[in-house]
């Protein structure tokens, strides 16, 4: 019997997840299908109950449901509970279990380009929203000890830092302070929507002086190279856009659902092609 998977969100027509997962199913000769479901906020509960009743094997959760979905699940993974958001649901033994693969997907993407362990790195996070929180908690979860957070509203950065129970040395900074301190970091991670199409001329941080070997990562992938990545490249930094994070979080969900490991590079190249790269 064909296994059913999917993604719920609103809007959902732009999602690249169906293309990525269905190609992986085909490549691995699996009898499964992944479908995008448009689910409005006011019917989220009914939709989740319906998916469970239909016997869906698992599904992803995207905007605007990542927080609200938690009220409709039977169990929530401890890391997802700490992050306060779920993006992956596994249907197992009659229960819907929520996980967050966004943060750990980002960590795996970062590990794929870093020649040294992340635990030894001093990291700067730009932004203190949902994506930043997932990344901060996941970096802490793998043992990173120094993570500073810079945000337009410093109090929001402080809130993120104090919410984490792991032993991490962190300082909350203004964006101006982060600009002055940028050469003290091994890795800079941009987690806001600043610089996303169509406002591509914007950047949260003017890159002017980086130490040698710095990695600058931006979770945005439209455009492929945001202003902050262009400036970092000019400074000689290794850069990474948001495609890797998207692919790795999807691959982690795929493994949780199926127990099979998809071809990461195949997934990545497919997404790049679909984005017109």
UniProtKB/Swiss-Prot annotation:
InterPro entries reported for this sequence: Aminoacid_DH-like_N_sf, NAD(P)-bd_dom_sf, SDH_C, Shikimate_DH, Shikimate_DH-bd_N, Shikimate_DH_fam, Shikm_DH/Glu-tRNA_Rdtase
Q: In which pathway does it act?
A: Metabolic intermediate biosynthesis; chorismate biosynthesis; chorismate from D-erythrose 4-phosphate and phosphoenolpyruvate: step 4/7
Query: What family does this chain come from, according to its entry?
Result: Belongs to the shikimate dehydrogenase family.
Keyword Thylakoid on entry: no
Biological process, per Gene Ontology:
amino acid biosynthetic process; aromatic amino acid family biosynthetic process; chorismate biosynthetic process; shikimate metabolic process
First and last residue of the signal peptide: none
Q: Which GO terms describe its molecular function?
A: NADP binding; shikimate 3-dehydrogenase (NADP+) activity
Q: Which SUPFAM superfamilies does UniProt cross-reference here?
A: Aminoacid dehydrogenase-like, N-terminal domain, NAD(P)-binding Rossmann-fold domains
Cysteine disulfide links = none
Lineage of this protein's species? Bacteria, Bacillati, Bacillota, Bacilli, Bacillales
Q: What is this protein called?
A: Shikimate dehydrogenase (NADP(+))
Among its keywords, does the record have Amino-acid biosynthesis? yes
Q: What class of enzyme is it?
A: oxidoreductase
HAMAP family recorded for this chain?
Answer: Shikimate_DH_AroE
Identify the catalytic residues. 66 (proton acceptor)
Q: Which reaction does it catalyse?
A: shikimate + NADP(+) = 3-dehydroshikimate + NADPH + H(+)
Q: Where on this chain does NADP(+) bind?
A: 127-131, 151-156, 219, 242
What does the annotation say about its assembly with partners?
A: Homodimer.
In the Enzyme Commission scheme, what number(s) does this protein have? 1.1.1.25
Keywords, A to Z, come to:
Amino-acid biosynthesis, Aromatic amino acid biosynthesis, NADP, Oxidoreductase
Pfam families the record matches:
SDH_C, Shikimate_DH, Shikimate_dh_N
Q: Where does shikimate bind?
A: 15-17, 62, 87, 102, 221
Q: Which species expresses this protein natively?
A: Bacillus cereus (strain AH187)
State its role.
Involved in the biosynthesis of the chorismate, which leads to the biosynthesis of aromatic amino acids. Catalyzes the reversible NADPH linked reduction of 3-dehydroshikimate (DHSA) to yield shikimate (SA).
> Please, which domain of life does this record's source organism belong to?
Bacteria
Q: Name one GO cellular component term.
A: cytosol
